[in-house]
Amino acid sequence: MNENLTRRHFLAATGTAALAAATTSALAAEGGSGGKPLKILGVSCSPRKGMTTAKAVQAALDAAKNSDARIQVELIDLGGLNIAPWSPKPPEDDMKDILPKFQDPALGGVIIGSPCYFRSLSGLAKCFLERLAPLREPKMVLADKPFGVVTVGTFRNGGQELTIEQIQAILLCYGMIPAGGRPPAFQGGTVLSTKDEISGDELGLGTARNTGLRVADLALRLA
């Protein structure tokens, strides 16, 4: 058991390093770090501000930022904010300050993070993603922009990949391009929280970093 776990940690660590090296080499071949800056927004859709989901998304953002000088990042923590579901009459809530960030011409990609509640995305994540609806009409503002998903559960197999699939299905409705991860998590970041802490899950944090690197790589290639 311990031997298998050690092997998984080794594969995760080497996979992250290999992806970072490949991304750096590819970007260098395309002309180095010149060009316009690109913003990658990370959104923590946990009602608990600054907790494990926010930390996991930040790990993905840090990896993205460190991959190329053109990448700028920003974490949007929805914890403690009031965001209602979509309605024909737009609610007056905190979404009014968030939506303009997704209309920024410099936006290159998005990373969405959600805790796994009952093997599903959080209610806050669902409300937030619904409220991006104004970006679909009359123009698909987010079309052809890459996105990644990072999820946090209290069990290793606690619904993380199911939650990723649910968020991917929603963002495909916005015309966005899903960016997966690398072994051992091909769909995105799958992080384990133990007693409100993720720092001990190097395997899971590696998948979050891989997701950030993939989003950054695609954003730069599509720019």
Q: Residues of each region from the PLM?
A:
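Short, glycine-/small-residue-rich phosphate/pyrophosphate-handling segment
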Residues: 143-184
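N-terminal beta1-alpha1-beta2 submodule of the flavodoxin-like/Rossmannoid cofactor-binding fold
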Residues: 2-5, 11-138, 186-223
